[in-house]
Amino acid sequence: VEIPKESAPVYEKRGLHLGRDRSGYDVYVPLDLLAKHALLAGVPGSGKTYSMLHISSQLSGEYAIPVLVLEPAKKEYRALARNTKMPDLAVFSPGAAGSFPLRINPFEFPAGLKLSEHITNLVQVFEGAFDLTPPMPFLVSEGIEQVYRDHGWYPFEVNDGSRSYPSIRELYDKVAKLLDASDYAPEIRSNLKSCLQVRIGSLITREMGNVFDVPASTLSPEEWLQATCVIELESLGPDAANFLTLLLMTLIRELLRQHPKAAQDRPRHVIFLEEAHNLIGPSTVANAENGDAKVASTKYIVNMLAEVRALREAIVIADQLPTGLA
């Protein structure tokens, strides 16, 4: 007896239309299966991006499901702006000299969330974007907590919207002060300071400062779960692009936890992640303690894939080779 796969496409006219099979029949994927996530793989020119465009336009235009597209190159998704069924689509090109700027303060976090939880998540974002060997993650965590305290925050305080947020530049200065006051040997102190200032400093220099070193964000944390957006990451460079990608996924993850919805037969939000090998790598015996950002980001995204399914968040990943991810 052959039992069909639960995730197999169907020929009934329901759900997302994928196209036609070799016999000319229309093929669909039931919408409720998308919350189990999806992977599109194929060589360049095989139609991955076209398929992602097709699926995202259906989700937003026909089902009114908000989508977030994280596009590392080519700027092809801005074509969705011509879709009359997606009038509320926002396209951002952070770091580029153009008319689609994006500003996001990493220290902003959803109302109702405890600060200590966001600090933990933000440290994971840094670990996934930059190579941080011990004790650098601890120093980043301590620096983040201290700059919040400078604004009157306490770690176990719940965000009620009444306090101001720190900035990346404040973290840059705070980490240097923490190291100056530490008991590390002079050479170790100097090396740690140089490493951290290079990494954090990359988020405040030139165009990056216009993106991350800002007092307020273009969209509030809550709006990211409601808006349909395309983020063009090409102008950021790999580290900053990974930082922004993980930061946005973190905000959505925090919002989903804060505002869970009862079980329903469709996703409430969908993230499209192009060129996923930039963040996700093959299984490895490497220990996260070696400071490998790819190991940390892979672990973070794998955990998120497992967690957000129950929260009706779908993640659609596209890449050339499945073996480059697994």
Stretch-by-stretch model annotation:
Residues 323-326:
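Conserved H-loop
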Residues 46-47, 239:
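A generic structural signal for alpha-helix starts
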Residues 54-313:
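P-loop NTPase motor domains
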Residues 1-43, 50-57, 62, 85-87, ...:
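Basic- and hydrophobic-enriched, low-structure N-terminal and domain-boundary segments
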Residues 319:
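H-loop/switch region of ABC-family ATPase nucleotide-binding domains
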Residues 38, 231, 316:
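Conserved beta-strand position immediately N-terminal to the Walker
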